[in-house]
UniProtKB/Swiss-Prot annotation:
Residues 441-481 form the LRRCT domain. Tubulin-folding protein; involved in the second step of the tubulin folding pathway. It comes from Dictyostelium discoideum (Social amoeba). This is Tubulin-specific chaperone E. Keywords: Chaperone, Cytoplasm, Cytoskeleton, Leucine-rich repeat, Repeat. Residues 33-77 form the CAP-Gly domain. GO terms for molecular function: alpha-tubulin binding. It is found in: Cytoplasm; Cytoplasm, Cytoskeleton. InterPro entries: CAP-Gly_dom_sf, CAP-Gly_domain, Leu-rich_rpt, Leu-rich_rpt_4, Leu-rich_rpt_typical-subtyp, LRR_dom_sf. One of its GO terms (biological process) is tubulin complex assembly. Residues 414-444 are annotated as: Disordered. One of its GO terms (cellular component) is cytoskeleton.
Length: 525
């Protein structure tokens, strides 16, 4: 192969380009060129699936490129790689329809300043096909090899009525491309971008955001309200805040599950870290800083899904999200959270006179299953939320401890608990999503039952726990059980606010665990 041909082949792909291997695996090109000890030119690929890789970009001790995930790199020849396509080509190939703007095809007439439109064979059928696209409001382009966005107005002319678009598992590689796409889809309401690897180049992004094309398309026309970004390599929260501020100003729901996010206290937008505005006066700087606060970045956000990340600090979440005015749902399942605290008091405005926190003021649903919360005092804190009525709280250490505590309690009537479990069978089945209804393990049933008994009394306004409704009878039974377990009839001043509240509803219990224990000790003497 000649040097000229070799060069053209190497330049066929570029660094950062998203490609498919001949086995269907998807990766990003991190290197192109020679590899010592091997003939020809090679592409260094970082695969999305680490199992597809063989090394860290190192061959015989020499580092050619680096990988985020351990062992996700390998080298490939160009013959083994599949290049992406434009949005319109991938869509038209999928539906076997050729889409072109035939109205722009003309030839010059012999008469001055007159052009004659070309009449293409089959053009009427093509226009009919275009009408079908234009009528579409939902389009799934998931797994298509889309790597480029067509110039305006090609996408607009064919898909301007789209309301929902799924571009998950494609080959797009930058947020600049997404800006270019959104300008042509003014009616888009819901966008899926899962399992893409979108880079963020500040200069390119700003240039595309601030530009209007000859057809008048602007990013201000974007109307996306629901954004799904599962496993999209968005661990940097500054990027999240920047794209939402400039692209998704009307966003109501964001799913950022499985992005390796560790903290979310970096709300300052990347775009304001440059020095373009060095001459701004002090008032303008203060105003700009205020606009970086969460309530300004996400004024319409109602639902945020941060499940399956590595978040450890609830305080980070509180300081960053606690003042969002519209937030009603927060999913923190499968993280590393160990505690829950609400800062401040009545004097600093963070708490109301009734002891409720003014943070997360409109939060109705919070999901905290599969975290590392190991003390009931942190769960008690959730009762300070003004609007909370639904909670998910499975598989935390404090829940697992219930069964151990119960098994060591000599005063526990085992048969009574078994009967209660049988009587509450419907709630138990709902709590397990109706899976394996007739084959539940007794240990799991008991854990679920004890979990509900210990959580429901602590959260007075809770209406749903672990996807199961809380009935009035269940709440009464749970609160009476809670009084039996925790009420101090000997020294009533040691009873906390929650116990005194339950006493005001149900009255002072005749028998408690403490009184029965004392009676047993007296009888023993």
């Amino acid at each position: 192969m000649s040097n000229e041909n070799e060069k053209s082949i190497v330049e066929y792909f570029y660094i950062g380009e998203r490609v498919k291997g001949d086995d269907g695996s998807v990766g990003t090109i991190r290197y192109q060129g020679k590899v010592d000890g091997f003939e020809g030119n090679w592409y260094g690929i970082e695969w999305d699936d680490p199992k597809r890789g063989k090394h860290q970009g190192t061959v015989k001790g020499k580092q050619y490129f680096k990988c985020i995930n351990k062992g996700s790199g390998s080298f490939m020849k160009y013959e083994k790689l599949i290049k992406g396509e434009t949005f319109m080509k991938s869509i038209s190939d999928k539906f076997h329809q050729k889409i072109d703007n035939y109205d722009d095809l003309y030839v010059d007439s012999t008469k001055e300043d007159i052009k004659i439109q070309i009449q293409m064979i089959g053009m009427n059928q093509t226009r009919e096909n275009q009408k079908k696209f234009i009528a579409q409001t939902l389009l799934s382009a998931s797994y298509l090899p889309i790597s480029e966005i067509d110039e305006s107005p090609l996408i607009y002319n064919n898909f301007k009525n789209l309301i929902e678009l799924n571009l998950s598992n494609c080959l797009l590689n930058s947020w600049t491309q997404i800006v270019k796409l959104l300008k042509q889809l003014p009616n888009l309401n819901r966008l899926h971008l899962c399992n893409n690897r979108l880079s963020f180049n500040i200069d390119e992004f700003k240039k595309e955001v601030n530009s209007n094309n000859e057809y008048g398309n602007s990013i201000d026309d974007c109307n996306v309200k629901d954004l799904i970004l599962v496993n999209s390599n968005l661990s940097n929260w500054s990027i999240v805040s920047s794209i939402c501020k400039y692209l998704f100003k009307n966003i109501e729901s964001i799913c950022l599950s499985s992005n390796s996010i560790e903290n979310i206290n970096l709300f300052k937008s990347i775009l304001n870290n440059d020095n373009e505005n060095e001459n701004e006066n002090e008032n303008e700087i203060v105003e700009q800083q205020q606009q970086q606060q969460p309530q300004y970045l996400f004024p319409t956000l109602k639902s945020l899904d941060l499940a399956n990340n590595n978040i450890k600090s609830f305080n980070d979440i509180l300081s960053s999200l606690g003042n969002l005015p519209q937030l009603t749902e927060l999913n923190l399942n499968n993280n590393q959270i160990t505690d829950i605290e609400f800062n401040g008091d009545v004097d600093d405005g963070n708490k109301s006179n009734n002891g409720k926190t003014n943070q997360f003021k409109n939060l109705k649903r919070i999901y905290l299953s599969n975290n590392k919360i190991n003390d009931w005092k942190y769960l008690d804190k959730l009762d300070e939320l003004q609007s909370l009525d639904e909670l998910s709280f499975r598989n935390n250490p404090i829940v697992d401890s219930l069964l151990i505590s119960n098994s060591n309690n000599s005063n526990t009537n085992e048969n009574e608990i078994e009967n209660d479990i049988e009587n509450n069978n419907n709630n138990i089945k709902k709590d397990n999503n109706n899976n394996n209804k007739n084959n539940k393990n007794n240990k799991n049933n008991k854990t679920i039952f004890l979990n509900r008994l210990n959580i429901i009394p602590r959260l007075s306004n809770l209406k749903k726990l672990n996807l199961s409704d809380i009935t009035l009878l269940e709440r009464k039974d749970a609160e009476l059980y809670f009084l039996y377990e925790n009420y101090n009839s000997i020294d009533k001043f040691k009873n906390n606010k929650k116990l005194n509240y339950l006493i005001s509803i149900h009255g002072e219990p005749v028998y408690t665990k403490m009184s029965l224990q004392l009676e047993k000790e007296e009888n023993g003497k």
